[in-house]
Amino acid sequence: MDVLVGCSTGINKIYNIHKKTPTGLYGALNTTSELNVMTFGWNSVENNEDYVFYGYSNGILKYWNQKEKQLIGEIDYGQSIKAIHPLNNDKLLVALENGLVDVKTLTAPITTQLAPMNLPTLNKKKSPAAAAAASTVGKNNKSKQVIVEPVNTQSFSLNVATNLSGFAMNPSNDKFAFGGKDVNLTIWDLEKQVKTYSAKFKHDFLNLQEPVSINVVKYMNDDKILIGSDFRIKAYDLRSKTNRSSFLDVSFSKHPIQSIQYTNQKEHYFYASDSIGKVFCYDVRTSRQVGSFKDSAGSVKDIAIHPTLPLLATVGLDRHLRVYNLDNRKMLHKIFLKQRLSCVLFSKEEPTNEIAQEEEEIWKNLEENKNRINNDDNDDNNEGNDKKKSISIKVTDNMDSDDDIEDGDDNDVEFPMEADSDDSDFDLGNSDDDNISVKKENKGDSDDSDDDSDEDEKPKRKTPAKSNLRNNNNNNNKGKNNKGKNNSSTKKTSQVLKKKFAGLKKRK
């Protein structure tokens, strides 16, 4: 799902919030003007979201094909543009700051440069800006002459007020409302071209007229409308013919209101922002604040709500695009877009099944990789615990020899032991698996010995060996963590065994 963002310097960006990647960049850098308004093209055109209107403070209106990144046409109105509304029957309405409302009917496809038409208006007095726009396109007579196309275009203008700030069309596109500095809320019928409603501000507690300064106008439906002044938000019921006062009057902020949005998804709530970064949600029924959207810094210039999904997007001077959930008011996305941002639009498309499947596959792969890494770590730990050495010392004695026991293949000392694979420590513990065996191998004849002597000699040979081995086992267990001590204790054990068996041989 794409979000269109308009920068105040003339650069326009498209960002896909599900793929989290920018998908488009077009426009030209222009620091002499700021972007005031941005809207999609005519609904009657196929793929109308591919076409976008941009209105700037220097009076330039541009019509872009954002899919092909191509500028279709532009108009110089000479005054700051406050509103752009593509109407039914190929009409285009543009409201200017000086109170001029220009309506054009385009009977041919817009494939060339647009230009203001030099046609008679319904006003008795033609505004200087309209006269200037009818003669040339641009300022200081440096741009080319206007191309007049009376055959393909019909136009009329309404000079409704001066110092116009807020402007809105009703959902039926047959009436428009506006307000501004010292201009109270007024509604005109576009077809009849007459004023149908004028609001009235209540006097304050001193019975003085409240200053009128309307910045934003927003229709809730054909019968109810919201306005945002410098410090307050008011709501009016247009069905009442006698009571022109507001039925809702809330003190929103101590700073000017920048934007107001309403959605049919939550018909009893509206959303508003001010010039210091506050974004609030209000309940129309109770006139109370429901909650706020956090993390904004600086002026929040524009708010957009998705037509079908519970998503709210904000842009402002802190150069971040933020997307919130309308239900719990939690921030879902925060994207830094480098330029100062003025306007934002949600595309109507919703996330496709392909995108959802891609996200599921990504999460599934991440889980599989995590499980694989954990299994590998467990296998490594088990292998490290299973790796052990078996060290043995074998003791043999040649009873026929009168010499001392010598080291060799026939005179070995064997002790079954276990040690870790990482070191060569000897474990002479007295566990069931650590059996100590002392073997004696007799070589040669012994005719002088008898049965009694043999029976007496056997226990005498085994007893001292076992006792000494157990003592040595205890000593070795105490010094197991020291490799040098274990090696020295093993040498001492072999020397003691040699001496003991040498004594046994002499006694025999």
UniProtKB/Swiss-Prot annotation:
WD repeats: 32-74, 159-198, 252-292, 295-334
A single GO cellular-component term on record: preribosome, large subunit precursor
Listed Basic residues bias regions: 497-508
Region (Disordered) location: 368-508
Biased composition (Acidic residues): 399-435, 447-456
Biological processes per GO annotation: ribosomal large subunit biogenesis
Segments of skewed composition (Low complexity): 471-493
Repeat found in the keyword field: yes
Domain of life, source organism: Eukaryota
Keywords from the UniProt entry: Repeat, WD repeat
Compositionally biased region (Basic and acidic residues): 436-446
Database matches in InterPro entries: WD40/YVTN_repeat-like_dom_sf, WD40_repeat_dom_sf, WD40_rpt, WDR74/Nsa1
Keyword Repeat appears in the UniProt entry: yes
Name of protein: WD repeat-containing protein DDB_G0290555
